[in-house]
């Protein structure tokens, strides 16, 4: 019985747990199979069980039908999760999130091609970066030669340097040509020196030829030469000068050349004369020096002279009293008359410094007392008040010239000076570089088609383009010029071969060219005076010493002889200038020689040195451009003739001059511009200024 009633609490607990379901759910209890009719019978009382451990209520002893139907029990413990239900309907779209962007997806398939339509031209792009230098292009045609640029203004002449001390030094190495010096005054003509002995014949040197030697003994006359070939005709007349060419366009600027190596340092110049400097201003007084060491006591001086007798009677000297206390400084009394010079007393101990008294009025100078013994050096006093600046003393005597001081540091920039006078208008400057590209403006109206502009400058070489297609087979080119000889091979020297058979005699060759002229021989002895010919005129000398002249021949026409000097032995030259605007104040160096017999003209210096004494004719022809020109023909640093030409703007003018001069051996003749204010001598590679000279007759 007791065992059958044990599950009753469990049934009550189950009923209480299902009560809320029935009241709230409706058909939940019926579905579980718990009918209320089963528990209508009276419930028997059993033993009191233990309180509920899991719930919050306690067992009630009352019949089941007495329970109210609307009573709700305590919520039971949460049950186990049930099975997953079916998915619900989709909810409303939520608010856009702010998450991180997802991984970039794969590219989608290509869309259909768009419609073709002509788009508007976009604005010009900004200039790209400068690309690397491209390969050198094909050689272009030579451009038209431009006009010569304007001549720059001449620089101001420098100050003359001080004359150096003349000391006979050792001859130095050949230095670079120095700057042209100032034109000196012509010196007096020296007396002719004594005639020297004939020296031995030396090798052909580079220096100036020496004086001619004494005439040697007359040699035997040589056999007469073969007659020369007949001439080809008389020389034609000079052609008409061509018309001046049009002004060419200025060529593009050339590529700047590489920087040359620095030249060798020139020899050190002689020391200059000592300069006379202006004595400097008095320096600032230096600080007070330290106290010197105590000197040795000097010798006791002799006693002074006995002074005159005083007016009062001298009293007896009393005993020396004790030193009293230092009293207050008294008022400055009137200056008394100078007393008698007493004997120098013994040096007493150094007293304490009293307070400074009021400055008294300057007294009359007293008599000079005997020199006392040297006292000890006292302590340094306080620095005195700086005195009033004294009047400026008289100028001192000029001091000895001092040595040049070291170069000082550059001074600070001074204040800007006053505005100077307005300068002359300068030359037209070069066109400036391209400016910064401005902002893109609004599109303007369509303008009228302009005229074709001038050809612009060559652009920067672009990048190398892609290789083009292979072209058709080209025509065979012309035969090229023979190349330069290659370097010698490295093969071994072969053994000498056997001698071949003697070939047939060759065809006689054509006569060779005339060889270079040989060195001139020594001058021969003077010939005997020739016979006077009444029918001849003044002509050339014959080898036998006579004068052939121009004998009246057939038809009364003169017949000239061959003469004494041949073309290769006659001193003559012609030199041209290939660069414009040479320096003034020095010989003009006509740097290219067309003919230079006897090598008398030196193109490196522009000076002709006379190799054979005689009468010479000199001529010069110059072009003028940029400014006026003033040219002179110099003989031994003395001007012989002057030529001046006034320049007209826009024209290329010419000037010429000449003179007949008698020269002795080693005399020098050259062309020079005396002033740098008229130095417009112009010459180029194709417009030559020239200088010529030749021997008319020897003396």
Curated annotation (Swiss-Prot):
Tissue distribution of the protein: In the kidney, expressed in mesangial cells, glomerular endothelial cells, and tubular epithelial cells.
InterPro entries: C1q_dom (IPR001073), Collagen (IPR008160), Collagen_superfamily (IPR050149), Tumour_necrosis_fac-like_dom (IPR008983)
Disulphide-bridged cysteine pairs: none
Pfam families (UniProt xref): C1q (PF00386), Collagen (PF01391)
Keyword entries, A-Z: Angiogenesis, Basement membrane, Cell adhesion, Collagen, Extracellular matrix, Hydroxylation, Repeat, Secreted, Signal
GO biological process: angiogenesis; camera-type eye morphogenesis; cell adhesion; endothelial cell proliferation
Highest taxon of source: Eukaryota
Region (Nonhelical region (NC1)): 533-699
PROSITE patterns the record matches: C1Q
Biased composition (Low complexity): 162-188, 211-220, 261-271, 281-296, 359-376, 440-458, 472-482
Biased composition (Gly residues): 429-438
SUBUNIT field: Homotrimers, or heterotrimers in association with alpha 2(VIII) type collagens. Four homotrimers can form a tetrahedron stabilized by central interacting C-terminal NC1 trimers.
Protein's recorded name: Collagen alpha-2(VIII) chain
Organism annotation: Mus musculus
């Amino acid at each position: 019985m007791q065992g059958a009633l044990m599950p009753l609490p469990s049934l009550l607990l189950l009923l209480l747990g299902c009560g809320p379901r029935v009241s709230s759910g409706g058909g939940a209890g019926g579905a579980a199979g718990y009918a209320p009719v089963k528990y209508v019978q009276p419930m028997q009382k059993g033993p009191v069980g233990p309180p509920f451990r899991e719930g919050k209520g306690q067992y009630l002893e009352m019949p089941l039908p007495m329970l109210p139907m609307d009573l709700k029990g305590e919520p039971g413990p949460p049950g186990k999760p049930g099975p997953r239900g079916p998915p619900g309907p989709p909810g409303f779209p939520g608010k856009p999130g702010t998450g991180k962007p997802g991984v970039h997806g794969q590219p989608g398939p290509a869309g259909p091609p768009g419609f073709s339509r002509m788009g508007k031209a976009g604005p010009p792009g900004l200039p790209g970066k400068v690309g690397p230098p491209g390969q050198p292009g094909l050689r272009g045609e030579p451009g038209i030669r431009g006009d010569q640029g304007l001549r720059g203004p001449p620089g101001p002449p420098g100050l003359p340097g001080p004359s150096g001390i003349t000391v006979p030094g050792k001859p130095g190495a050949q230095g670079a040509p120095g700057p042209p010096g100032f034109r000196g005054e012509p010196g007096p003509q020296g007396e002719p020196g004594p005639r020297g002995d004939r020296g031995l014949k030396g090798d052909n040197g580079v220096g100036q030829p020496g004086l001619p030697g004494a005439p040697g003994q007359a040699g035997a006359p040589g056999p007469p030469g073969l007659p020369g070939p007949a001439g080809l005709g008389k020389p034609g007349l000079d052609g008409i000068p061509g018309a001046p060419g049009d002004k060419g366009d200025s060529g593009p600027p050339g590529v700047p050349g590489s920087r040359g190596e620095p030249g060798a340092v020139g020899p050190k110049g002689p020391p200059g004369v000592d300069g006379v400097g202006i004595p400097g201003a008095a320096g600032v007084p230096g600080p007070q020096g330290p106290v010197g060491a105590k000197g040795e006591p000097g010798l006791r001086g002799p006693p002074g002279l006995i002074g005159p007798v005083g007016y009062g009677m001298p009293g007896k000297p009393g005993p020396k009293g004790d030193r009293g206390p230092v009293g207050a400084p008294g008022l400055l009394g009137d200056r008394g008359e100078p007393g008698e010079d007493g004997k120098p007393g013994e040096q007493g101990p150094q007293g304490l410094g009293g307070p400074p008294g009021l400055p008294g009025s300057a007294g009359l100078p007293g008599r000079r007392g005997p020199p006392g013994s040297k006292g000890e050096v006292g302590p340094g006093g306080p620095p005195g008040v700086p005195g009033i600046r004294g009047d400026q003393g008289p100028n001192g005597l000029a001091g000895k010239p001092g040595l040049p001081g070291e170069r000082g540091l550059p001074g600070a920039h001074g204040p800007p000076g006053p505005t100077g006078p307005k300068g002359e208008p300068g030359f037209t400057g070069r066109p400036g570089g391209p400016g910064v590209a401005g902002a893109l403006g609004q599109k303007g109206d369509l303008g009228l088609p302009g005229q074709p502009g001038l050809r612009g400058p060559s652009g920067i070489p672009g990048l190398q383009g892609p290789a083009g297609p292979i072209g058709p087979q080209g025509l065979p080119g012309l035969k090229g010029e023979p190349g330069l000889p290659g370097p010698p091979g490295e093969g071994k020297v072969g053994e000498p071969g056997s001698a071949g058979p003697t070939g047939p005699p060759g065809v006689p060759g054509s006569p060779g060219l005339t060889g270079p002229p040989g060195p001139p021989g020594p001058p021969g002895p003077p010939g005997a005076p020739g016979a006077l010919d009444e029918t001849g005129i003044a002509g050339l000398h014959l080898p036998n010493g006579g004068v052939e002249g121009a004998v009246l021949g057939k038809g009364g026409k003169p017949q000239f002889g061959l003469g004494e000097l041949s073309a290769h032995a006659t001193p003559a030259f012609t030199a041209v200038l290939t660069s414009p605007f040479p320096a003034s104040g020095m010989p003009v160096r006509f740097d290219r020689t067309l003919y230079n017999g006897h090598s008398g003209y030196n193109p490196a210096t522009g000076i002709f040195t006379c190799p054979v004494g005689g009468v010479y004719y000199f001529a010069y022809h110059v072009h003028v451009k940029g400014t006026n020109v003033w040219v002179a023909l110099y003989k031994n640093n003395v001007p012989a003739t002057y030529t001046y030409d006034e320049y007209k703007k826009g024209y290329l003018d010419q000037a010429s001059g000449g003179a007949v001069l008698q020269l002795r051996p080693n005399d020098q003749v050259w062309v020079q511009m005396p002033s740098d204010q008229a130095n417009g001598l112009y010459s180029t590679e194709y417009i030559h200024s020239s200088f010529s000279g030749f021997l008319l007759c020897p003396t």
